[in-house]
Swiss-Prot record:
Annotated GO MF terms: 4 iron, 4 sulfur cluster binding; metal ion binding; quinolinate synthetase A activity
EC number, as in UniProt: 2.5.1.72
Binding of [4Fe-4S] cluster, residues: C113, C200, C297
Organism: Serratia proteamaculans (strain 568)
Name recorded for this polypeptide: Quinolinate synthase
């Protein structure tokens, strides 16, 4: 597995935190959003990593809470003419790729993803051009332009199966953008993978020493880890999986206590799935005082109630997602290729970031 660039140079400025709302303001915006959803013939889809009150509102109004691909598929199958995507920008793009006829709005178009930012189109195209003999596989957490350059789009729930398939055909792989997920898949499959060196700023902060100290405090707890985490952390896990796979593991594991190494936004749905279990956040590198993300994506936190209301009310250049028609067609090819592969395996594809 080859390295691309100095990952330590990939430090992104975080957005300012949303201004906290008091209870009266929250109630006002919740009701306003409900009214606007009806007026705009819109449905709200929210990612597992958004704040609990946002996930609850999506469910209450007939929307869904899911990973980015399932959000996009739900929106595509829903009769609403407008989708309000509470997540980060590539999720809005994915929704638009699958629903070109629908209006796709976001609370803000400035909600980024470090995996997306860490895989810029021009640099990635040049990298692919320098290795023309390799099949290009990109994670769902990428821009429409990067997807359009790929042969396959993949989610974490089906990554191992897909790479095993390609390896069995003798294909050599370019994998992008997450180096930790790429390392995990390479270890599971033994495939020849040339890996882009991006990382999720949330999962990259989990560290083994702090996790082992927490395990010592709760020796009977199971450790659940997303494969975007460093491999040393993954090696400590009782269950490794995508967002939806971790929620399923939380339900099925016999342990009454769970230490969870992923964005803490997942706790809303995970606690619904196993209300009698005790959930603990896995400690991040700085253990509170100096952590950057502190186990919550700062861009996901931009999806506040006021921002959602503004997106529905105003739309326009600050909120509406557009994907060039030609680019959309190119990006749809590797996405559909993955969906067809999954259907052949009778695997339900869920669970990117």
């Amino acid at each position: 597995m080859s390295e691309m660039f100095d990952v330590n140079a990939a430090v992104y400025p975080f957005p300012p935190k949303p201004v906290p709302l008091d209870d009266a303001q929250k109630a006002f915006y919740r009701e306003k959003i409900k009214i606007l959803l009806k007026q705009r013939n819109a449905v709200m889809v929210a990612h597992y990593y958004t704040d609990p009150e946002i996930q609850a509102l999506a469910e209450e109004t007939g929307g869904c809470v899911a990973d980015s691909l399932e959000m996009a598929r739900f929106g595509s199958n829903h009769p609403a003419s407008t989708l309000l995507v509470a997540g980060v920008r590539f999720m809005g793009e994915t929704a638009k790729i699958l629903s070109p006829e629908k209006r796709v709005l976001m609370p803000t178009l400035n909600a980024e993803c470090s995996l997306d930012l860490g895989c810029p189109e021009e640099e990635f195209n040049a990298f692919c051009d320098s290795h023309p003999d390799r099949t290009v596989v990109v994670y769902a957490n990428t821009s429409a332009a990067v997807k359009a350059r790929a042969d396959w789009v993949v989610t974490s729930s089906i990554a191992v199966e897909l790479i095993e398939h390609l390896d069995s055909l003798g294909e050599k792989i370019i994998w992008a953008p997450d180096r930790h997920l790429g390392s995990y898949v390479q270890k599971q499959t033994g495939a020849d993978m040339l890996c882009w060196q991006g990382a999720c700023i949330v999962h990259d902060e989990f560290k083994t020493q702090a996790l082992m100290r927490m395990k010592a405090l709760y020796p009977n707890a199971a450790i659940l880890v997303h494969p975007e985490s460093p491999q040393a952390v993954v090696s400590l896990a009782d269950a490794v999986g995508s967002t939806s796979q971790l929620i399923q593991a939380a339900k099925t594991l016999p342990n009454s206590q769970l230490i969870v190494a992923t964005d803490r936004g997942i706790f809303y749905k995970m606690q619904q799935a196993c209300p009698d279990k005790e959930l603990f956040e896995a400690p991040t590198a700085g253990e509170g005082a100096t952590c950057r993300s502190c186990a919550h994506c700062p861009w996901m936190a931009m999806n506040g109630l006021k921002a959602i209301a503004d997106g529905l009310e105003h739309g326009g250049v600050l909120h509406e997602i557009h994907v060039d028609a030609a680019l959309r067609q190119k990006a749809l090819i590797p996405l559909n290729r993955m969906l067809d592969f999954a259907a052949e395996l009778r695997v339900q594809v869920k669970g990117n970031a």
